[in-house]
Amino acid sequence: MFSKSLILRNYFSLLDSKLLDLWGSALKQFARGWGTLWLSMCLAGSAFAAEPAKSTATAAAKKPVAQAQRNTANAKPKAKTKAPVKARVDTRPSFGKVAGLHDVSDELSLKSSVALVVDQDTQEVLLSKNDSAVLPIASITKLMTALLITDAQLPMDEMITITQDDVDTEKGSRSRLQVGTSLARGELLHLALMASENRAAHALGRTYPGGLQVFVGLMNLKAKDIGMTDTRFVEPTGLSSKNQSSAKDLVTLVQTAHREPLLRDLSTSDSHVVDVGRHSLIYKTTNRLINNPSWDIGLQKTGYISEAGQCLVMQTKIAGRKLIMVFLDSAGKLSRTADAERVRRWVEAKHRAVVPQT
């Protein structure tokens, strides 16, 4: 089959050799224009004649597609599956790591960059590591929140409803306390201390007489009153890295909170069941040492945000001594309790070395 360009070249070549000498330049342009039009019509006609075959082929190709569409329409809809929700992982280094506190060594090779162990009765310091460093304290904050609630002697049976204001926008942390859930103040206090429930702690501060801002102001005033000179609070949960303190100050906080029987009981319980509507929720302690028979814990609180690392404070009895333990900025999920175990074995070993075995 000849191409359009080849036919045109042959045609104009013929005109140039036979006709143009006779008819002149004017007739030459007329002949060129008429010839181009005629050949274009011929080629277009041949292309048009071939089009039905293409349409037929296209129609034939569309039949399976149409059939497949009908089959899909008649098929039963498949159940939709939701993609699993992935927790937001924060990989930022802790303030202590950035400050180089982990480079400081200690005799027990602790994973915590800050540690302080004090005899509760004599105030003797048994172990100290970066105890004046001011760092974020995460949910250790909730001890101060709980202390204010008990100080105010608010009715523990008063019902409090979780609202949108209690939802964490700082870290996007999850909670099983849905907006609209109503629980007694005492139950919210229990969940805040034992299970470190953030919405519970925020609701306690939000519903305090005067509101949240008044509550936070009182947190700072209370800290000052009991001698916490390195401490600052900006909210009641510990989700903000601006809630900061030192190990020395936290020893004071633990000693003060330990005087409250309710805080001792709630912080050291291993589980609690709350009724929410037509179902129940089971909450468990965040401190794995609570159920360990080797430990006698009188008060405790755990904490974690990326800026603070793993944190743990406790009042406990080891080898007959009442001790206050503070561990901040521990690296690794289980490292804070592992550090506590190292200290316990160390204290017991020192006790055995001093007291003759009978």
Residues covered by each model-derived region:
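N-terminal secretory targeting signals
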Residues: 2-114, 349-358
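Hydrophobic alpha-helical segments, especially transmembrane helices
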Residues: 29, 33, 143, 316-318, ...
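Ubiquitous "structural anchor" signal
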Residues: 41-44, 154, 311
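Active-site-adjacent loops and short helices of periplasmic peptidoglycan-processing enzymes
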Residues: 70, 75-81, 85-248, 252-261, ...
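Domain-terminus/edge residues, biased toward the C-terminal soluble/receptor-binding domains
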Residues: 228-232, 238-358
